[in-house]
Amino acid sequence: MPDERTGGKAALKDRVAKLGLQFLRRTLGELVAIRECVHACIEGDVSAIAQLERITHRIHGTGLTFGFPGISQHAADLERIAQAALRSPIGDPEMLEKLEAGARRLADEVEQTATAAGVPIQS
């Protein structure tokens, strides 16, 4: 029979796993906001770049917390690109390409990780 500590550790591990799945579901939903931000950046909306930076910063930290290093790394990469975009001229084609590519890489990683975890992806 497990003692209280062992049972408590198992319950904590189960709770963290459930929170990780919630993170994946939420992040799948945030991919829509990320795509909208990138599109708005292409249209010249500087506030969308700042919003993109905030979203990716949150995904970066939370992904690492719940054991999704690939998601965390791609979010960190996109966060750095967004920070650089804030210092670049609005509409810089090279920067816009980097934003689009970074968003694509993050989306691919989130979708692959969610699929592997059994989280359904809405199209």
Set out the residue ranges of the language-model regions.
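Extended, amphipathic alpha-helices with heptad-repeat/coiled-coil or helix-bundle character
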Residues: 46-84
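Helix-loop segments that flank and shape redox-cofactor active sites
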Residues: 33-50
